[in-house]
């Protein structure tokens, strides 16, 4: 168990009978009152979010989840199938992938981390950066070069992100999977 003060982003806690990952913490202190810790949480089973507050000394159950490095194998509607180094396969429901679904493509070489709770695969964490090909974007607008000009682009996997104006169809780009932002052309 941890106190609310000790909880950090990335920790997984048990809250209202479900595992939640802490996305953000904010501590406020007032003159005579005890510190208040505000947590932004994401439910790992339902893929929903909430914010809640605790007193600084409140006890919180922290849990350690099993994580395995896996590679994407194939899609069997509605499950994405991942395989570990020992050729064990794990099914992850499409709704549990969240934003990661936009970056998953057949034949991808990146290794993902699959998270387990009670022996069941519940989420997938993509690598921090990935390289994908642009399959559709509008041509650049001539003369529109003042400042940082961005335009929408569709990448392999079906996701849409904002890219720099100079990016063309067929270009390979690096993407930050935590924010979904274009980093550079590769």
Swiss-Prot record:
MF annotations from Gene Ontology: translation elongation factor activity
Glycosylation sites: 32
Entry keyword set: Cytoplasm, Elongation factor, Glycoprotein, Protein biosynthesis
Signal peptide boundaries: none
Matches recorded under Pfam families: EFP (PF01132), EFP_N (PF08207), Elong-fact-P_C (PF09285)
The protein's annotated pathway: Protein biosynthesis; polypeptide chain elongation
Post-translational modification: Glycosylated ar Arg-32 by EarP: arginine rhamnosylation is required for EF-P function and rescue of polyproline stalled ribosomes.
Main location: cytoplasm
Any one GO CC term of the record: cytoplasm
GO BP term, example: peptide biosynthetic process
Keyword rRNA-binding: no
Coiled coil start-end: none
Localization in the cell: Cytoplasm
NCBIfam families reported for this sequence: efp, PRK00529.1
Family affiliation: Belongs to the elongation factor P family.
Role played: Involved in peptide bond synthesis. Stimulates efficient translation and peptide-bond synthesis on native or reconstituted 70S ribosomes in vitro. Probably functions indirectly by altering the affinity of the ribosome for aminoacyl-tRNA, thus increasing their reactivity as acceptors for peptidyl transferase.
Entry protein name: Elongation factor P
